Amino acid sequence: EVSGELKKMNEDAGRRISSNLSKMVRLKTVSHFAAAETDEAEFVKFRQLLDDLYPLTAEAGQRRLIGRTGLLYRIPGKSAEKACVFMAHYDVVPAEESEWDFDPFSGEMKDGFICGRGSLDTKCTLCSVMEAVEEKLREGWIPAHDLYLSFSGEEEVEGEDADAIVK
């Protein structure tokens, strides 16, 4: 059951959230089926960025790295029964830059949109979840039930992290 009052986002929050998503898009978390081609350092930077941008979530969520890139946060609720999970992935497919009208990892704002890999699939979802949880934690919120945040860095290559998180 969802209840509560919806708040209108103020312009400062909108700018902050846009900036945070832009920072995520700029990190080249490109997955390759040949794992040796994947730049692991970009994935490490992405995870550090999450800790830096969302310190309350990082602390309350007892973040765990599962497998190479899987992230699992558990935010204890008033009850461990009937837990809720939000999921997203933060890896992207390779981008042939010559086929783009702009740098696919620029994260630039253009005509009110954030441009680049992950801005729609699905760093935007991950950013939205983290922003919402961070805001609620800032308000002193304790979820009614345990809340899990599950993020994979291998979705684009059908990696094992999501399965490992479930287990």
Predicted feature locations:
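Acidic/His- and Gly-rich active-site-bordering loop/insert found
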Residues: 1-122, 126, 136-144
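Acidic/histidine-rich catalytic neighborhood of metal-dependent amide-processing enzymes
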Residues: 120-167
